[in-house]
Regions:
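C-terminal region of N-terminal signal peptides and the immediate post-cleavage residues
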Residues: 43-62
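A generic local structural motif
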Residues: 67-72, 100-102, 196-199
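A short beta-strand-turn-helix
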Residues: 63-81, 106
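Glycine-rich, low-complexity intrinsically disordered regions
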Residues: 11, 17-19, 58-69
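C-terminal cap of thioredoxin/glutaredoxin-like
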Residues: 2-46, 171-236
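Structural alpha/beta surface segment adjacent to cysteine/selenocysteine redox centers
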Residues: 79, 84-90, 95-171, 206, ...
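Short secondary-structure boundary/capping elements
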Residues: 64-66, 96, 192
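Short, flexible loop segments at the rims of nucleotide/cofactor-binding pockets, characterized by
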Residues: 62, 92, 189
Length: 236
């Protein structure tokens, strides 16, 4: 086969144009690199938000669901059935679920353990959770729990801090205010709330309220369906 002799290119002040194949190659490399970067960002986001850690081993799941210092609204002596709620005191959906949870507690008093975990998502929900934990240190968690939900329409969805409101609740409950302030401001209280959030994310919690019954996430469409699940757990 005869090869054509290379030609000496003519002198020109203009840069030589890239061939179409080289242009396509360069474009494809850029697109591929872009997709790699996007995929990395998405994966990092999943782990940061907790989506990548939803499947914790069974033993770890049990520890994450209920910690020794988790707040218990009521405790069943046999410990057979445990109902856990990850909540946000400022969450409107949590407020809407509150009467149903109270009815559930009434129906299963002494037979089901009810546990509350913090999962704050709103402007003042960390402060509200801190107030509840500070009240718990004086044996008044349930009282503050009720007060926060029953008055949520008054302080919720506010841009400004509602700390004074929460301290007012503490005074109304007759708490030692110096002791309340100490626990409220304690870094250990903030760490407890952050750990609740981390546990929730590891368990697949992405919003509130999220319920677990004996370790299984509850997904029901109505109150009767929830009652049926609790009855089945008690009968098992």
């Amino acid at each position: 086969m005869t090869r054509n002799k290379p030609r000496t290119p003519a002198t020109s002040d203009r840069p030589s144009a890239k061939s179409p194949s080289r242009q396509r190659f360069s474009k494809n490399v850029k697109v591929s690199l872009g997709l790699v970067v996007i995929a990395a960002v998405v994966l990092i986001g999943l782990f940061v938000l907790g989506g990548g850690t939803a499947s914790a081993p069974p033993g770890e799941r049990a520890d994450m669901l209920v910690r020794p210092d988790s707040q218990r609204l009521q405790v069943a002596e046999d410990g057979k059935v445990t109902f856990v709620e990850f909540l946000d005191f400022e969450c409107e959906a949590c407020r809407a679920a509150y009467p149903g949870i109270e009815e559930l507690r009434r129906l299963y008093e002494g037979r089901v353990t009810f546990v509350v975990r913090n999962f704050p998502l709103h402007n003042n929900s960390v402060a509200a959770a801190s107030a509840a934990e500070a009240a718990a240190a004086q044996g008044k968690f349930e009282d503050m729990y009720h007060r926060l939900f029953e008055t949520q329409t008054e302080w919720g969805e506010q841009e400004a801090s509602q700390e004074d409101v929460f301290f007012g609740f503490a005074e109304e409950l007759g708490l030692d205010m110096d002791a309340f302030r100490q626990v409220y401001d304690d870094p250990a209280t903030a760490a407890l709330i952050q750990r609740d959030q981390a546990d929730g994310r590891a368990l697949g919690v992405t919003g509130t309220p999220t319920f677990f019954l004996n370790g299984d996430k509850v997904d029901v469409s109505g109150f009767q369906e929830l009652i049926d699940l609790v009855d089945a757990a008690l009968a098992a």
